[in-house]
């Protein structure tokens, strides 16, 4: 949100426009192809980056947000290929191990002021390390009367939330994982299947019809999805489109399995039938491109190429 607000404020300074991309853990070529699709430049291997460098010219300086960066090696290769481009890059990440960039840490303001952001669960503030996501989830559980503050505090302590341990990933936050653990034990199989799909889908957000189809739950998913929403386990960035916070996704992925090939096939078939949905579904297409690259599946890569030609990109 801060990156979007910054882009809105500086927009007049960039004749080449302000552009936002969700990048995740995709490889450098997929990142390049994302920009090529947006800018209408060639996407073949040999012309991909030279064409982007020409597009990002001194005459058209461009502001580009690369949101939710995860793969340092892929990002380093991508940015190094475009180091001569006339673009201002804003990269958002929970952590960054790149040289050649300037780091601007962002901290929730009430944390630095020592104030309570969620009065209903104020006693949990220190226990949850002032983490806004964990506090929001705890507040949702308490406000929905799923559990009271005292019982939740006891659960967290019994789970070792106050212990010091090494984490395996920047999204491995014990205070959030424990809240997910509490909820998971109380969710029905349909709700768990919905969470599993959202945890393994690589696009930004998933339409309700796609979510129910991939989870194989049909209309039976409505009630469980509403419960997930009340408990703030899911996000609804657009009406009828659902996603997980990256930290919640990490906590769910470790306990679920989903056939990623089925997700790949679903979104290619969807866009082949409904090319008018490209704007909302484009990150799923980029995820399919990355899947085809990493699996070295020539047939699927050619299918994606035909789809892109149909879409006029």
Please give the residue ranges for each predicted region.
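Hydrophobic alpha-helical core bundles mediating ligand binding, dimerization, or RNAP-core interactions
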Residues: 52, 176-180, 248, 264-267, ...
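Alpha-helical sensor/transducer elements of the RecA-like P-loop NTPase core
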Residues: 1-2, 29-36, 81-141, 151, ...
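Extended alpha-helical scaffolding segments used for macromolecular assembly and cargo binding
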Residues: 190, 258-313
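Loop-to-helix "switch" segment enriched in basic
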Residues: 136-191
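A short hydrophobic beta-strand->loop->alpha-helix junction that borders the nucleotide-binding pocket
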Residues: 18-27, 108
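Short glycine-rich substrate-engagement loop in P-loop NTPases that contacts/grips substrate
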Residues: 39-50
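A conserved switch/coupling segment of P-loop NTPase cores
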Residues: 4-15, 48-118
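C-terminal boundary/linker of central alpha/beta nucleotide-binding cores
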Residues: 3-4, 135, 139-140, 181-265, ...
């Amino acid at each position: 949100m801060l990156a979007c607000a910054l882009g809105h404020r500086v927009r007049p300074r960039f004749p080449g426009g302000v552009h936002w991309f969700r990048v995740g853990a995709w490889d450098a070529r997929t990142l390049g192809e994302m920009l090529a699709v947006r800018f209408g430049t060639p996407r073949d291997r040999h012309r991909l980056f030279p064409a982007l460098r020409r597009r990002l010219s001194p005459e058209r300086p461009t502001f580009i947000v690369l949101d939710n960066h995860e793969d340092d090696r892929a990002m380093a290769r991508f940015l190094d290929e475009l180091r001569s481009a006339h673009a201002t890059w804003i990269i958002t990440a929970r952590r960054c191990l790149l040289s050649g960039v300037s780091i601007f840490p962002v901290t929730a303001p009430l944390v630095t002021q020592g104030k309570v952001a969620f009065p209903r669960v104020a006693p949990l503030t220190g226990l949850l390390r002032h983490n806004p996501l964990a506090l929001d989830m705890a507040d949702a559980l308490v406000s929905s009367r799923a559990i009271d503050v005292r019982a939740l505090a006891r659960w967290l302590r019994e789970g070792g939330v106050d212990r010091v341990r090494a984490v395996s990933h920047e999204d491995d936050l014990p205070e959030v994982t424990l809240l997910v653990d509490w909820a998971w034990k109380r969710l029905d199989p349909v709700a768990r299947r919905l969470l599993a799909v959202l945890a393994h889908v690589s696009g930004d957000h998933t339409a309700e019809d796609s979510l129910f189809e991939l989870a194989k739950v049909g209309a039976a998913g409505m009630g469980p999805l509403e419960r997930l929403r009340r408990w703030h386990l899911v996000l609804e960035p657009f009406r009828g489109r659902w996603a997980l916070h990256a930290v919640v996704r990490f906590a769910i992925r470790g306990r679920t399995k989903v056939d990623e090939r089925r997700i790949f096939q679903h979104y290619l078939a969807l866009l082949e039938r409904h090319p008018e949905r490209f704007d909302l579904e484009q990150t799923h297409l980029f995820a399919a491109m990355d899947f085809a690259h990493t699996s070295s599946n020539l047939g699927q890569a050619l299918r994606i190429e035909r789809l892109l030609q149909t879409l006029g990109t």
